[in-house]
């Protein structure tokens, strides 16, 4: 084992020395949280920072850090297990409000982190939930309406890896950072005079590709089967993934879990917000050799996927105006637009001890909902975009007060999303995964491609195309806090291409609620404050703690209040605790003193 590790280290050093024009790809910290009596706790801090991307000025960025590693772009990879109860302590130290959405996670709407769960600057948000997802590659990112693009562009986000027993039983790579790698694919534009990243809504496409926030990245991969967890973390660009030697690779999972069998491909479309797990067999590669992961996004390559039409973006492919801006690349365009470009340079290193050397023939068994299970159908239509207007869903632009669609708890619904529009889009659904059952139009035929036949939460909508999927809205209901559905091109969602829905339960609608009267003790308090309910039948829906001037310092959705609320991080002073009742949604406030 020591010999193999030494070989790997030496080959990595030699490869880096021989490829000085490349930068070593950042591998985000694997963060397992802290195990306690009530579950697993993750402490995450969002902050403004800087990163040296290019020669000259540093670039102002944003990041998410754990207590272990202080990042300057992107955040740690959260490793969780199915059935874990996880507690998130999210502190927003940006100079502005934001949110954190747990993309792909099945959880209560009040914990979802969409545009409704705003975290003001200087505030601690404490959602928690039981992990019900099967093994999958998920991610987390800001979702503040009209600020999602700018916050993601700055680098705020990270991966979530969910593990379970079914995945653990498979003979596939799973040693993080050795034969199992997360890779967030994106690109950025930099202003020529300051090196600042372009974050305006018109900055849809980057000029320089990066992986995990690393420009011109390279990585050493062992001579064996490796697992790459790919995320399209772009603002708007889609990728047509392949390798420079046109090798076959194998799709084993998409957005929300493993497939039944590996799917062999040489090209793989990946649109914004989508994730895919692939296996690459490097056993026949020569140690010291190289290859590249590429985006085959040239006009000719794209039209191989959809004859006579672009796969991504406008009918004339990605935006490619000729008007220069004085920065890098054309306005609303990018130096990479309509081209085939390198994503990642790969150096082949020695195999590790216990290496996986074959691709499995089968994976897991999934049980999907069928048309026979459907209790309701819906059609959503994409509109807008003409003459520079914002894109819409069902003719409306999003507001937090718009009337949500109402879904019944445990309903199995069939949704058809129709894109008779001038642009391609990615449709993303919060709360639950869906199963695509058909496609139509868009020059891609009606067959759902094999690599997208698993559980999805994001799906590509080509121009003049539509998708139909089935989803079951189970486990969580909340008539107050909605979930979202929207285009995952960040510029489009920021402009209002979003809708919302609530999941209603028929139970408890007429249930009588207890009084919301309560007291706090001890008062003054030092480390914890306790709530004493006058009526034990009262259910606490939300607790917010503010200063006497109204600044929010703590947000606790459906708190586990019985063992006290931890206020040890608060400065000494007078605070106001606001408690919202679950049934009536009425709010009652009490003052307390922090010693």
Q: Model regions: which residues?
A:
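C-terminal outer-membrane/trafficking sorting elements
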Residues: 16-19, 510-521, 525-595
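Bacterial Sec-dependent N-terminal signal peptides
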Residues: 1-21, 551
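Edge beta-strands of extracellular beta-sandwich domains
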Residues: 304-307, 499-500, 587-593
């Amino acid at each position: 084992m020591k010999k193999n590790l030494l070989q790997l280290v030496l080959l990595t050093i030699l490869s880096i020395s021989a490829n000085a024009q490349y930068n070593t790809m950042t591998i985000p910290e694997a963060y397992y949280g802290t195990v306690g009596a009530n579950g697993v706790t993750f402490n995450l801090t969002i902050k403004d920072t800087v990163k040296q991307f290019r020669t000259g000025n540093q670039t102002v960025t944003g990041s998410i850090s754990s207590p272990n590693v202080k990042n300057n772009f992107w955040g740690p990879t959260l490793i969780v297990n199915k059935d874990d109860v996880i507690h998130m302590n999210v502190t927003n130290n940006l100079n502005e409000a934001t949110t954190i959405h747990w993309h792909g996670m099945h959880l209560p709407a009040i914990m979802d982190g969409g545009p409704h769960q705003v975290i003001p600057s200087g505030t601690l948000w404490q959602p928690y939930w039981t992990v019900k997802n099967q093994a999958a590659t998920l991610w987390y990112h800001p979702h503040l309406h009209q600020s999602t693009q700018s916050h993601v562009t700055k680098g705020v986000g990270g991966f979530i890896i969910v593990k379970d027993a079914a995945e653990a039983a498979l003979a596939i790579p799973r040693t993080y950072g050795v034969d199992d790698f997360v890779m967030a694919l994106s690109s950025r534009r930099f202003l020529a005079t300051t090196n600042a990243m372009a974050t305006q809504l018109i900055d849809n496409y980057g000029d320089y590709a990066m992986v995990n926030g690393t420009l011109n990245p390279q990585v050493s991969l062992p001579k064996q089967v490796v697992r790459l967890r790919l995320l399209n973390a772009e603002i708007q660009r889609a990728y047509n993934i392949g390798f420079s030697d046109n090798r076959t690779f194998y799709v084993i999972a998409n957005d929300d879990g493993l497939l039944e069998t590996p799917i062999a491909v040489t090209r793989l479309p990946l649109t914004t917000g989508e994730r895919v797990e692939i296996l690459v067999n490097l056993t026949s590669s020569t140690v010291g050799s190289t290859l590249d992961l590429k985006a085959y996004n040239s006009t000719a390559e794209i039209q191989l996927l959809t004859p006579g039409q672009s796969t991504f973006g406008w009918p004339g492919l990605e935006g490619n105006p000729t008007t220069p801006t004085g920065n890098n690349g054309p306005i609303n365009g990018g130096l990479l637009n309509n081209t085939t470009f390198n994503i990642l340079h790969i150096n082949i290193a020695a195999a590790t001890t216990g290496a996986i050397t074959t691709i499995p023939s089968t994976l897991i068994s999934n049980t999907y909902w069928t048309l026979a299970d459907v209790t309701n159908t819906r059609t959503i239509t994409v509109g807008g975009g003409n003459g520079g207007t914002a894109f819409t869903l069902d003719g409306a632009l999003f507001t937090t007060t718009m009337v949500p669609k109402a879904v019944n708890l445990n309903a199995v619904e069939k949704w058809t999303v129709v894109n008779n529009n001038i642009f391609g889009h990615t449709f993303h659904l919060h709360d639950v995964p869906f199963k695509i059952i058909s496609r139509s139009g868009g020059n891609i035929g009606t067959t759902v491609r094999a690599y997208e036949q698993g559980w999805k939460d994001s799906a590509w909508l080509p121009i003049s195309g539509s998708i139909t999927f089935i989803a079951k809205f189970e486990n969580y209901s909340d008539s107050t806090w909605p979930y979202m559905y929207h285009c995952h091109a960040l510029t489009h969602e920021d402009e209002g291409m979003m809708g919302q829905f609530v999941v209603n339960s028929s139970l408890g609608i007429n249930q009588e609620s207890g009084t919301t009267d309560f007291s706090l003790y001890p008062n003054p308090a030092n480390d914890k404050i306790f709530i004493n309910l006058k009526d034990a039948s009262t259910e606490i829906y939300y607790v917010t703690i503010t200063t006497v001037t109204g600044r929010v310092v703590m947000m606790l959705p459906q708190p586990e209040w019985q063992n006290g609320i931890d206020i040890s991080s608060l400065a000494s002073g007078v605070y106001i605790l606001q408690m919202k009742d679950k049934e009536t949604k009425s709010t009652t406030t009490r003052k307390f003193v922090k010693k």
